[in-house]
Amino acid sequence: MGLFTISCNSQDNNVAVQKESVHQFVLTDLNGDTFNMSSLKGKKVMIVNTASKCGLTYQYEILEKMYNSYKSDNFVIVGFPANNFLWQEPGSNEEIAKFCLKNYGVTFPMMEKISVKGSDMHPLYKFLTNKQKNGYKDSSVKWNFQKYLINENGYLEKIISPRTKPDDPSVIEWIKT
């Protein structure tokens, strides 16, 4: 029979959470090209799941204005089309790219269509929604246009509700500080 010891030190009550970084992810954009999140080191990043047929689709216009206003301040927006909520993103990657450009002039990086919840959730969204991975907080994607704010080191700092506009004063303050 084996012998084992259990430590009852009060300092062991807090489980250490290992933070990972978004910089570890290699993705594919809407054009089928490789996009390394490590290329965003030193920049603040807003990650947002998008949809073309949603009541919140107007946020594309705000996102594009923000991207153009703050990209010189080391701020980037990365969009992730997803069809998880009432099938509001039914198009192909090519159709999504055309829609975004034609209707909103989107120039910020847009990744290929992914799943942001469920058994086929993309690994990046597993990271964003799991405290054990992101070191910040457990969450779930509530709807299209939920925003995740990532600091210059690739760590999750804030989660913004889908209904909160991207240019909310709290977000602008976060970009500027």
Predicted regions and their residues:
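N-terminal "domain-start" segment that seeds a small globular fold
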Residues: N9-S38, Y58, P123
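Amphipathic alpha-helical repeat scaffolds
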Residues: N49-K53
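Thiol-/selenol-based redox modules, centered on thioredoxin-like
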Residues: P123-K126, K131-T177
